[in-house]
Amino acid sequence: MKNAISLFSKHKNLLYNNGMITFDSLTLKAFVEENQEFLQDARIQKIQQPTRRDFIFQIRKNGDTRKLYININPQFHHVCFMSKQSENRRRIEIPQKPPMFCMLLRKYLENSRICKINQPQYERILEIFVETYNEIGEKIYLCLAIELMGKHSNVILYNDDTNVILGCAHNVGAEKSQVREMAGTLPYTYPPKQNKTDILTYNGIIDYANLSKDFYWFSKSFSELVMGEPLEKLKEYVALTNLSPVISNNYKKYCLFSSLLTDSIPQKTVNEMIDDYYSYYQEKDKFVNLQTHLLTLTHQKKKRTANSIAKMQSQIDRESNCDKYRLYGDLIMANLYNNSDYTDKITLFDYENNQNITVELDATKTLKENANKFYKQYNKGKTSRQKLGEMVEELLQTKSYLEQIEYSLNKAKTYEDLLEIKPELVEEQNPKPSKRNTNAPEKIEKGEFTIYIGKNNRQNDYIVSKLAKDDDLWFHTKDCAGSHVLLKGDKPENSLILECAQLAKEYSSASKSSKVGVIYTKRKYLKKPPKANLGYVTYSHEQEIILD
């Protein structure tokens, strides 16, 4: 568990504390100006709410249909029109039963006409004003306020005439905020004003160290980029003069002006910049969350397996004493006629250990009956010990299997890699047919030879059962988790065999260790036991290479 938690924390720190910037008011201003024309008089056709924190509005105008994506997650809060590619990156899944707030939005906003969009001055709020009709056919005007303010992000629907809230994505009670409550039937109010200055009307001296504190529009990340720029240039930026949106090559930053961000990737539009940047981090977040979840499950299963092995091993140790009962039975049977029946104990000479032993007896039974009782105890213990030994062997195979899963999870690079491993850990009820093909093993061409490397148990199983022919060579690290490596081709040189052994070590949990044993043998000497786990094989006729 600790390993899984530390992995989760490590990746979260990389995502949120090592460069990703938050959506700011100037970016929202640029988005509004860019999309004002399309949204004006457009119609909201369909509303979906994949999770508590994101929404999809299908909007249509003049034959052009776009998906407005709203995210109010504290880490990823933003708004943009999604491309098909970014929708796939976000791994959006629509629930069969929509949430109550989604039902409310559908009731009031589907088929409504957008009258205008607005950004209240300096705020990270996008207002979408709509014209629609109530139950009795009267025209009404509503406003959807999309507040993109970190942990306070929210979506609020209110009546534009009365200012009364109809519903919120998240209700905010007095216990959470004494300044601004949010719930149905309450009046909608803007956040408290910040004591800042509009730089467009300012003509004094700039304190660059406090730029984000003193002026509207300047977030901390944007302030870092414009450090030292003259006042007139700062005004041009806020006026959105000469927009040229870019994302840095390492995806740590985005900027509305390419001149401020070197080593960057040009974006066609502000929307494309927002969409690409945040979907990149959402994809990474989905990957980390699933990887952490699966690693946690693996560690839990490993712990339960280890506990079961220890418990059964203890039982085997106790049952190992059953041999004494056979000895008691043998000694009693050898001395039946030298001793009396119905006694509570008997002293006999043990010829194996050359000593006298005293055996406690059941005084209500004859000596022969006592001997048979000891034989039964011996046979019971022997059978139990044998069954426990078989169970321990199965559990050791399970332990090895889980170690292989753990290795594959840590080596996974894509979300698809994790999805391929997930069924080995999670039994889904009524699983949906997969739309994606199983990932292919890694393939390396070497002249007339081909090398295959499995990235998980499923691929390892596929390599052995489907790809390999009898005389192909199979490689695997000895006594540790790793990929199955297959060398296809006739009579490979020793140098190629050594290269495959190196690959088997590289793709294993012992990749950074020294003196690692790699075994290899022909496919025809591999055997998959009945009911064995995916990727598990036994082997014979193997040879071993020791690698530093």
Report the location of each language-model feature.
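Extended, highly charged segments
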Residues: A4-D548
